[in-house]
Amino acid sequence: MAGIANGVGLLISFMLICGGMPKGHALGTSPYCEKVLSRFAPPGNCLKKNGNALCKESCANEQFREGVCLHLPKPQSKLNCYCSVLKCP
């Protein structure tokens, strides 16, 4: 009985070392979650009070479902309108 337990423990250890720890679902890896800079949104739209709504409307005109004002690629970047096919985190 102890030999079986040792064998199972060895098998689990081997699987963790070779395969790594299970990571669950990866977020933001889908091409549908990729955020693309809007081509039609006028500059300064995101600075307005209803900037996210204007951005979403511009993205809808570009055949996207979601649009949001973001600081990309860095937090220090200028606020711009980005579009994506799906709403992703």
Swiss-Prot record:
Transmembrane segments: none annotated. GO terms for cellular component: extracellular region. The keyword Cell membrane does not apply. It comes from the Eukaryota. Keywords: Antimicrobial, Disulfide bond, Fungicide, Plant defense, Secreted, Signal. GO terms for biological process: defense response to fungus; killing of cells of another organism. Disulfide bonds join C33-C88, C46-C69, C55-C81, C59-C83. Its main location: secreted. It is found in: Secreted. Residues 1-26 form the signal peptide. Belongs to the DEFL family. This is Putative defensin-like protein 40. It comes from Arabidopsis thaliana.
